[in-house]
Amino acid sequence: MEALKTVERFRVIRTIDVAVTCYPERTYKAALTAAQRTVRRLVKKDLLRRYRTDRFQTVYGLTKKGADWLDEHGVEATSSVRRVSDMTNPEHRLWLQFLVLCAEARGLKALTESELLRELNRGVTDVSRVRQGYLKVRVQRPQGAIERDLRPDFVAFEADGVTWGEVDRSKRGAEREASLAALVGAIGRTAADGQVVRRMVVFCKTERIEQRALAVLRHLALELAHHVLIEGRFHLRETEPGIFEVWTALLSPLPGGRSQLVDTRIGHVGVQRLPIWLPKVRVDSSNRHSTAGWFNENYLPYRKDGGWG
């Protein structure tokens, strides 16, 4: 049932989504083998239908029979095959929902961008009050600074705050690079739902995209290091390749009603590769792709300071 509920939720899935949802405790090859068996069985029963996208990705949609089966088992559902058949390149949505499922496999609540917007606007009837952004930031541009409402590709909620996730399938232009720098400056601030943004992770499809994102952050770190750390300013410190700590100065009370500024780490920023090799893995001896990055490592849904335990 979990596999069918997942395709009802996202409307389109890959086999790797079933591996994450149903078999995250297994090794990757074992999880993939079990997921392939599950998907084949559901396709044979006409509960799922298989499609190939223009980019030669195999995806699955929920059939009318599959939706009826879920309805009979207490899950409201509708067929998605017509919508899936019209999709040409759903790669971005496939990756962000994969990362959401990975976060949930770690025991976190997680939402895609569209799910987050629905939650932010639940019960809102006045169109003028509909929220389109999750966090307001000040973006520096050559023409001057402007305020922008930004929203993540996905979010994951941890005990200390929220993780803001970005999926970069292409190199950022100047506008998006400026937005990336602005988001770093927003670490530690409160988002529209009252959650504090503690982490931002940028997932990059290629090494070139990854290196450019790292260059933006390293340049920002050098610029910020020239300024003394005081309240309202922040420093960005790379502690290991692709992982940065965000520091600021916060007032700490002293005896006698006095206070002092104390350097305080308020969050993290990470840059890492999308695990595009995982869907390419074959379970037989012909496999030439790595299985690195599965749940036995500190990689999914994102690299975490101190690991996942």
What positions do the PLM features span?
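Active-site metal-binding core of divalent-cation-utilizing nuclease and nuclease-like domains
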Residues: 104, 109-164, 169-176
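Glycine-rich, flexible loop segments associated with nucleotide phosphate handling
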Residues: 29-39, 143-150, 197
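Hydrophobic, Leu/Ile/Phe/Ala-enriched alpha-helical segments that form helix-helix packing faces
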Residues: 22, 39-43, 99-107, 184-191, ...
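Nuclease-adjacent, charged terminal/linker segments that flank catalytic cores
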Residues: 1-86, 308-309
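Soluble or luminal CAZymes and related metallo-dependent hydrolases
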Residues: 34, 91-95, 175-179
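Non-catalytic C-terminal interaction segments of nucleic acid-processing enzymes
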Residues: 174-178, 185-309
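Amphipathic alpha-helical dimerization/coiled-coil segments
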Residues: 73-116
